[in-house]
Amino acid sequence: MPLTGRKIRVLVVDDSAFMRKVLKDIINSDPELEVCGEARDGIEAIEMVQKCRPDVVTLDVEMPRMNGLDALRVIMKKYPVPVIMISALTQEGAEATIKALEYGAIDFIPKPSSSISINMRELKDEIIAKIKEAAKVPRRFLELRRIRLLRVQKAKKVKPSVPARIAVAIAASTGGPQSLLKIFPKFPENLKAGILLVQHMPPGFTRSFAKRLDSVSKIDVKEAEEGDVVEEGKAYVAPGDYHMEVTLRGGKPVITLNKKPKMHGVRPAADPMMITAAQVFGRRTVGVVMTGMGRDGAQGIVEIKKRGGITIAQDEKTSIIFGMPKAAIETGMVDYVVPLEKIPETVVRAVEMIRGGGNLGRHVTIPR
């Protein structure tokens, strides 16, 4: 039972009666959750938010009369509540979902296009866990976010391809897309490191997210492919349903993708990426663990620190979900605990420290 002693109230919004029933059955099967109402479109959703005062809303992206994005804007502006988007596995669905996360949605659940009831029931544990985590999100994160991200006009000149000698390994989950979109524009074009990013997302969504990150960043961002050489000033996003690892090939750091068993219930997981990055780059590795639920990234932080690298965790105040950073900090192997807005400058300082041959002591906390 939640700390309040009452069940978590959930409003289910979907234009499909069948889909609403599947979601209601899943939610009501957990003793800590209850469905307080349902709606068929965005207009009904706004009315029901006022009537049943839910703790969490599950909101379909594509609906008649008023779609999920438009409803989300109104809900976050007038009746702030944690919202989880239910999105189709299409390019349009993925792009709309990324936009919804920018507007203030906490998380999303992919909606398979066929065998919906079978697939959604396979997702039962994930749906229940995400609803419970969303209900805990501090109110300060519940607002209509207008992230004014200007598309960056990248220089047309061809940049020289320089294999990275330093790696920045970033782990993120719930709350990650919104947070990463805030910090990636701050990385300088001439960053003397390659960035390896694992954001927990299913196939299709990672490609849309990589494109969105690229559009607002000075560095080049792409969804990672098998055999990519890790280069300076470039970021590589692990593709959905593949673990991303790093190996040495011909003296160059190369990305490999695999479908080894899920770790922490997810694929991609950050730990395989961070551990192999540490093995390849050694002390020239910077590890960053950001907002998200679970423990992914903690093992990677330990491995990076053991090999002399520099480790960073996002602080509790700016983490939408503090699970992953907390687990990393509890290893005792984190050098810097910093607010979200300080992560880019801390990474740049760490890269410069490594290039200059310096070494950070452990347990260093950058003050606000």
From Swiss-Prot:
Annotated positions of the 4-aspartylphosphate modification: 60
Record PTM: Phosphorylated by CheA. Phosphorylation of the N-terminal regulatory domain activates the methylesterase activity.
The UniProt record lists the keyword Signal: no
Signal sequence coordinates: none
Domain Response regulatory stretches: 9-126
Location within or outside the cell: Cytoplasm
Alphabetical GO biological process terms: chemotaxis
InterPro entries hit by this protein: CheB-like (IPR008248), CheB_C (IPR035909), CheY-like_superfamily (IPR011006), Sig_transdc_resp-reg_Me-estase (IPR000673), Sig_transdc_resp-reg_receiver (IPR001789)
Molecular function via GO: phosphorelay response regulator activity; protein-glutamate methylesterase activity; protein-glutamine glutaminase activity
GO cellular component: cytoplasm
Catalytic activity: [protein]-L-glutamate 5-O-methyl ester + H2O = L-glutamyl-[protein] + methanol + H(+); L-glutaminyl-[protein] + H2O = L-glutamyl-[protein] + NH4(+)
EC number of this enzyme: 3.1.1.61, 3.5.1.44
Active-site residues, Swiss-Prot/TrEMBL: 173, 200, 296
Coiled coil (residue ranges): none
Cystine pairings recorded for this chain: none
Enzyme class name: hydrolase
Free-text note on domains in this protein's UniProt record: Contains a C-terminal catalytic domain, and an N-terminal region which modulates catalytic activity.
Physiological role: Involved in chemotaxis. Part of a chemotaxis signal transduction system that modulates chemotaxis in response to various stimuli. Catalyzes the demethylation of specific methylglutamate residues introduced into the chemoreceptors (methyl-accepting chemotaxis proteins or MCP) by CheR. Also mediates the irreversible deamidation of specific glutamine residues to glutamic acid.
Family matches, as NCBIfam families: PRK00742.1, PRK12555.1
PANTHER family associated with the record: PROTEIN-GLUTAMATE METHYLESTERASE/PROTEIN-GLUTAMINE GLUTAMINASE, PROTEIN-GLUTAMATE METHYLESTERASE_PROTEIN-GLUTAMINE GLUTAMINASE
Family stated for the protein in its record: Belongs to the CheB family.
Annotated protein name in UniProt: Protein-glutamate methylesterase/protein-glutamine glutaminase
Gene that encodes it: cheB
